[in-house]
Design a protein with these regions (language model features):
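C-terminal motif of bacterial Sec signal peptides marking the signal peptidase cleavage site
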Residues: 2-4
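Surface-exposed acidic/polar loop and edge beta-strand patches at domain peripheries
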Residues: 6-185, 189, 193-253, 257-384
Length: 384
């Protein structure tokens, strides 16, 4: 479960460097790894069972998760959000609207009033069990939404390393021996432990999974979508309209530039979404695939827009975010891939579960093309 690095200092950008750093800043971190020692992930129980980073090539391999080293070193919480980073974190929705848990009752929907609940920002999850390939966490929470409804819930979060056969079966592929890969799955559950039902009157929560990944000049997010569905292909006005040179769609695939040079966000509705989103970093030749639960026929997704909403259940199923300078400041060189569960319409004692899987592939371009064609319908050469 715990891994040691080589005696020589590791280079920044490698998994070994991040492991050494996190062993100092994050007591109790866990390392899951496969039998070869090449595929590894780091998990922090102190940060909600967050997957901090991963690698496909051992300690000297590329580290895929974005980390906020300065903030992690101090371990200080900050107003609004403590942006520690991490490759996959557990959040709850909705962010905005009358059912929001990020704004207090009666407040204006402005950044000054926006606050991530401490339970999903800086508090620890309880470690239930851990092996070389899986770790299980739990947390009791009490949150209040914008209309004043108190919501009590129990959270279960299981993190599992995926093997080659898991990935072959999941994606319907046959991985070449020349391809290095790391993949993990999180099973995230919320149970209504209160005395009132979660519904359209009292409000509902959703499970919201977000991945912070290292951006580059040549990274492109790609998302397939249903071409025959009704409604806009995507929502792109979260932070103002995304320029055409940064966002386009063609032949059933959305292309969204992820260079951390322009703050922007897109969302895809459940009627348009498919259960995949990913990215390709042409500089490092890394293909990333995220696969998640997308229940057919369920169109009730919480709406995260910062306003009182006409329809608080008309939100997105999948999102992508590109960081950039905002008011002269920037969080870091990262982008995000996000998925959400449907709105949790739960009577007391009932549970909703959402799975999210992240897989990184490195190898010869012809092998990456085979994976990309199978999942996204296009070769990696077109992801630009």
């Amino acid at each position: 479960m715990f891994s040691s690095c080589t005696n020589t200092p590791s280079t920044k950008g490698t998994f070994g460097f991040d492991l050494e750093f996190l062993q100092k800043s994050e007591p109790g971190i866990l390392v899951l790894e496969d039998a070869s020692g090449d595929a590894k992930i780091i998990i922090s129980p102190n940060l909600q069972g967050r997957v901090m980073t991963s690698t496909a090539e051992g300690d000297q391999g590329t580290s895929f998760g974005w980390l906020n080293y300065d903030l992690l070193a101090t371990r200080k919480t900050t107003k609004h959000m403590t942006a520690f980073g991490g490759e996959e974190r557990f959040w709850l929705g909705p962010e905005g609207g009358q059912f929001s848990i990020y704004f207090k009752k009666g407040q204006d929907f402005t950044f000054e009033n926006w606050q991530v609940p401490k339970e999903i920002d800086s508090e620890a999850f309880q470690l239930v069990s851990a092996t070389k390939s899986e770790a299980k966490f739990t947390k009791e929470m009490h949150v209040e939404n914008y209309i004043g409804t108190a919501l009590d819930l129990h959270v279960d979060r299981d993190v599992r390393l995926l093997g080659k056969e898991n990935i072959n079966q999941l994606l319907g592929i046959n991985l070449s021996k020349d391809v290095k890969m790391v993949g993990f799955e999180t099973a995230n559950s919320i149970t209504n432990t209160g005395k009132i039902p979660w519904n359209k009157t009292n409000g509902m929560l959703s499970i919201w999974i977000l991945s912070m990944l290292n951006a580059s000049e040549k990274t492109m997010v790609v998302a397939p979508f249903k071409q025959d569905a009704e409604g806009p292909v995507y929502t792109d006005d979260y932070f103002g309209k995304v320029p055409a040179d940064r966002l386009r769609h063609e032949n059933g695939v959305i292309f969204f530039k992820a260079d951390a040079k322009y703050r922007s966000k897109i969302g895809i509705s459940p009627s348009r979404a498919l259960p995949f989103i990913g990215s390709y970093d042409a500089e490092k030749q890394v293909l990333t695939v995220a696969q998640f639960d997308l229940p057919g026929g369920n169109s009730q997704y919480v709406n995260g827009k910062w306003e009182l909403q006409k329809d608080p259940l008309s939100g997105d199923a999948v999102n992508a975010y590109n960081d950039g300078v905002n008011n002269g400041n920037q969080l870091g060189k990262f982008y995000e891939i996000e998925s959400s569960s449907p709105a949790a319409e739960l009577d007391p004692g009932k549970t909703l579960t959402h799975h999210h899987r992240t897989i990184h592939f490195m190898g010869p371009k012809q092998d990456l093309n085979q994976i990309s064609l199978k999942v996204f319908g296009i070769p990696v050469d077109q992801m630009k």
